Amino acid sequence: MSQTTEARWVTEARKNLHVREIKGPQHCAEILQYWRDIKRSGIKDDETPWYTAFVGAMLERVGIQSTRFESARSYLTWGTELREPVPGCIVVFARDGGGHVGFVIGQNENRDLLVLGGNQSDAVNVRSFPRTRVTGYRWPAGEALPGDARLAVQSAQKSTSEA
């Protein structure tokens, strides 16, 4: 991957920035497809926390097998461990009641991570997260790391809900 090339799973994820849950008895077809993409077709609603389904679906769509599991923490043993974040890596966070997972795309001036993820305030979007919540960084096994591993400084709203 060259300096100017984004990880292909992040490019795929950006195509989903319009996706959000539908309140009420209807359910978002794209979110239900994320579950099918990770071989979890038994989940039939968009209220079930879907951040891991989103990450897994983006990986599967570009030919990389995900954990195919519902837990964000399942990514702590997947792929290759990284000591520091690089653009496009998977980041796993701790949160009350569980975890969260998404793709690192940058950092803000305070060095909070900017994360492209699903089920962030019920939508696919970019939000900032404090590094103090990080439990791990992972990279797909067999995939080349980016040539320029520096995180671009950008801005994003702070994450307030990932469940």
Across the structure, where does each feature detected by a protein language model lie?
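N-terminal capping segments
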Residues: M1-I64, E143, G147-A163
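...with weaker cross-activation on analogous glycine-rich loops/strands in unrelated enzymes
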Residues: T4-A7, G56, I64-N125
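Glycine-rich catalytic cores of cysteine/serine-nucleophile enzymes that process amide/ester linkages
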Residues: P25-E47, A94-T135
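Short alpha-helical interface elements
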Residues: D37-G42, G79-E84, P140
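Glycine- and charge-enriched low-complexity intrinsically disordered segments
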Residues: N125-A152
